[in-house]
C-alpha cells in the first residue's frame, strides 16, 4: 500500500485551522517509520512556551492499553486472579465480573468518574488516590450482567491496576517502564497520576474559539485508567515498536489486540483497553483520551501497517482529526449518505431509563443517547446508520441497534413538555445504591438539583422538563472529561404522590432515589 503523502501533508497543514485551539501535535508511522511529525501552537499561551514534538502531554485513557499490556506480560492468565475482584466490591449483590471483563469494559459497573458528580464533587476539587476505592466499594448493582454488553467504565482499570500492583509488589510506573516504555523506546514517557502537576508544566485549555480559552484546573489522581504523560516522539516510538513486533504472536500488542467477544460469542468492539472500529474504510485498533483541557487519539491499522497519533491541549475532537489524517493517507472518501427525514423526536428507553433524542439537519441525523452524540445518514436502503449504531421503527417505537455495545433498545415515544411545575418534586431524596442524597429546589419557574455524598456538596445543576414526569439534569463540567452531559431523571409515583426518582446517564444508569 502506498501513502498519498501530498494529501497527508495537506491534511496536516489543515489541522490548526480545522481544530482551533492553543496547540497540538500529530504524527504518522508507516511500515515502522515516522513519515510525519508536527507540533504547532503553544504549550502555555501566557508564558509563550511553544508546543514541541518532545513536549509531554497527558494521553489520558490511552493509558488503559498500557495497563492491560503490563498485566498480561507480568501475570499472564487473568483468570487466575478473578477471585480478587470481590475485595474491591464488598457490597455487590450480583454476579461479579472477571478480570478479563474488567479489561474489556464488560463488567456492567457504573463509571466512578460519573459517580463523583452524584457524590457531591466539584469539577476542580482534589480527588486523592485514597478517595477512589471507598467510592467503588459502595457499589451494590450494575447496569447489566457481566459479559453481556459493553459500557465504558474507568473504575474497571483502577481495580486492574490495584490487583496488578498487589500481586507483583511493584509500582505501576515501574511496570510500565520495564515492560513497555523501555522496550518501545519511549524515552520520556512516565506515569504522572496527579493532574495538578502535569509533565513539562504543559497547560490544558477549556473553552472554544467562540468564547475564548482558559486554563483548565484539574485536581484528580488517576492510575490504571489513565495517568501516562508522553510526547509525540514517545508515541511514535510506540507505534514503530508495534510494527516491529507485529509477527511475534507473544508480543504485547498482538496479545492485547486479539478480537474480543461477549460471553454469548458475539464479537465485541472493545478489549484489553483497545477499541476495535472501522475508520476511513479500514479496520483499526486504538483509543481516545480526555481530561479537561486535553484530547488525544491514536489509531493503528495493522493490515496497512499504518498508525496515526493526535494530541491537543484543548478540547477539539482528536478522534475527528486523527480520522482525517488516516483518510488522507489512504485516499479514502467517505460515501455521502442521504439525509433521512421524519425521524426527529424523543423517546424513552424503559430498560435503561435513558432519553433518546433525534434531531435533523441538512447533513443527516444527530442521535443523543450515549455520552457523545452519534451522527447518522441513510444508506441506499433508507436505514439511518452511524458508527456502530442504526435506527428503525416498530410502530411508534424507535428501535436503536448499537452493535458495538451488543445492545438493542426499543424506546417508547415521549411527548414533549416545555414547562412543568417542579414544586411537587422539590425536596430531598436518598439513593441506597450510592449512600448519597439528591436535593431538588424549585423557585419562580426554575428548577435545580444538587448532589451530596462522599465527596461533599456539589454545585447546583440545572433541571429542565422534557416530558411527562421526565426531566434532564445538565452536567457540563466534572472531574473527568467529557462530563456526563444530560442525566435523565424519571419521577416515580404511588397513588399520584411523588415517592422517588430514577436517575441515569450512559456511564451510570438506573440509580433509584427514595423521597426522604
UniProtKB/Swiss-Prot annotation:
HAMAP family: D_aminopeptidase. Residues 476-486 are annotated as: Important for specificity. Belongs to the peptidase S12 family. Homodimer. Hydrolyzes N-terminal residues in D-amino acid-containing peptides. Its EC number is 3.4.11.19. The active site is at residues 61, 64. GO terms for biological process: proteolysis. InterPro entries: Bact_CellWall_Synth/Modif, Beta-lactam-related, Beta-lactam/transpept-like, D_amino_pept/lipop_sf, DAP, DAP_B_dom. Keywords: Aminopeptidase, Hydrolase, Protease. This is D-aminopeptidase. It comes from Cereibacter sphaeroides (strain ATCC 17023 / DSM 158 / JCM 6121 / CCUG 31486 / LMG 2827 / NBRC 12203 / NCIMB 8253 / ATH 2.4.1.). Substrate binds at residue 480. Inhibited by beta-lactam compounds such as 6-aminopenicillic acid, 7-aminocephalosporanic acid, benzylpenicillin and ampicillin. Inhibited by p-chloromercuribenzoate. It catalyses: Release of an N-terminal D-amino acid from a peptide, Xaa-|-Yaa-, in which Xaa is preferably D-Ala, D-Ser or D-Thr. D-amino acid amides and methyl esters also are hydrolyzed, as is glycine amide. One of its GO terms (molecular function) is aminopeptidase activity.
